[in-house]
Structures are given as structure tokens and as C-alpha cells.
Amino acid sequence: MSRYRGPRVKIIRRLGALPGLTNKTFKSKSSFIDRSTSNKKVSQYRIRLEEKQKLRFHYGLTERQLLKYVRIARKAKGSTGQVLLQLLEMRLDNTIFRFDMAPTIPGARQLVNHRHISVNNGIVDIPSYNCEPGDTITIRNKQKSQSIITKNTNLFQKIKIPSHLTFDSTQLRGFVNQTVNREWVNLKINELLVVEYYSRQV
């Protein structure tokens, strides 16, 4: 399944707020899941499906990419669900988004793809690059690159940058202090249901 490129309003109304997909908010319709269905097996499957879709659309992943991350998380030490969220949160495109350098994760991915971003003084154009504690993320020393980021940081300031990151808005320089903690994930999600959804595929 390819990355979703359709209307974002439709997704938000169906699944609720997904800040990585869009910074706009809409009045949600009732969930596409029929909670009152008498077939509990089908209902539980759809609940898990909804949580999986939230994760996929928020981070802008294909089905294959998300499944790959689940498999990696299952092999790691610790809670599979929390490791999964850490893997997704530490992606370069998401880190750029959390720095307020872009209004959405797709916007951050575009900055990376267009080679506006440097990590530890080297250009990185891979959105899935895994950021690690100690990484320094900067903007290419080009007027166009710096102009885009400055505009974004001025327009799309969020309430608070998570504690595992530090951003110097005057130098347009970000630092990864540590691996993200669960409480700093800015998505309302039950990651255990996502792991359960994929339990037969991994």
C-alpha cells in the first residue's frame, strides 16, 4: 500500500486529530467503527485497525514501512509498543517536525528530500534516518533553505518542544538530547492495539 496522498480532511474526521498529517482541526464525525456491533471479534479487529491507521497516517508511512518497524520493535528489548513509538519519533522527518521547522511531517519530509537538512555537518536526504542522542541538526548554508525554515518556525510554533530535543531558533540549530520518552509522543494512540493488529504478520 502506497503513502496516502488524498484529502486530509477525510482522514481527520474519521480518525481524530493527527498533528503530523495536518495542523488543522475539524469536527469529528462518529467513528467509522460500529462499537455497538454484536460481533465482538469483528469489532475488536476494527478497533485495532483504527489505531494502526492513526499511526500510519500521522507518521506518513506506507503499510510496508510500518510493518517493518513493528518487526524491528518486536526484536528489541523492552515493550514492543513503546519501542515502536520511539523508532517512529526518532525518524529525521518527525524530528524536524517536532523542532517546528515544518508544519507537518509531510512538510518535513519534503525539506529532507530537497536536501535542506544537515545532520552532524553532513547533508542527509533520507527522511527515515534514525536520529540518535548527540546528533546536531542544522539547515544548509543557503539563503533559500534558511528562508524556508525561518518562515516555518515563525508561523508554526507549537506549545512546547519535547524535552528530548533542544532548538536554537536564532541559529536554526537543533540538538537531540536523548531518546524520546512515551509521554512526549504528541499523538493520542494505544500502541498495544497496533502491535496486536500485526501479531499474525510478524
From Swiss-Prot:
Which residues belong to any copy of the S4 RNA-binding domain?
A: 90-159
Q: Name one GO cellular component term.
A: small ribosomal subunit
Q: GO:BP terms for this protein?
A: ribosomal small subunit biogenesis; translation
Q: Which UniProt keywords apply?
A: Chloroplast, Plastid, Ribonucleoprotein, Ribosomal protein, RNA-binding, rRNA-binding
Q: Does the keyword Transferase apply?
A: no
One GO molecular function term of this record is:
rRNA binding
- Which InterPro entries does this UniProt record tie to the protein? Ribosomal_uS4 (IPR022801), Ribosomal_uS4_bac-type (IPR005709), Ribosomal_uS4_CS (IPR018079), Ribosomal_uS4_N (IPR001912), S4_RNA-bd (IPR002942), S4_RNA-bd_sf (IPR036986)
Question: Where does it localize?
Answer: Plastid, Chloroplast
Task: Note the SMART domains from the entry.
Answer: Ribosomal_S4, S4
Q: Does the keyword Nucleus apply?
A: no
Q: What single Pfam family name could you report for this chain, choosing any that match? A: Ribosomal_S4
Q: How does it assemble?
A: Part of the 30S ribosomal subunit. Contacts protein S5. The interaction surface between S4 and S5 is involved in control of translational fidelity.
> What is the purpose of this protein?
One of the primary rRNA binding proteins, it binds directly to 16S rRNA where it nucleates assembly of the body of the 30S subunit. With S5 and S12 plays an important role in translational accuracy.
PANTHER family membership? 30S 40S RIBOSOMAL PROTEIN, SMALL RIBOSOMAL SUBUNIT PROTEIN US4M
Q: Which family does it belong to?
A: Belongs to the universal ribosomal protein uS4 family.
Name of the protein in question: Small ribosomal subunit protein uS4c
**Species:** Jamesoniella autumnalis
Q: Which gene encodes it?
A: rps4
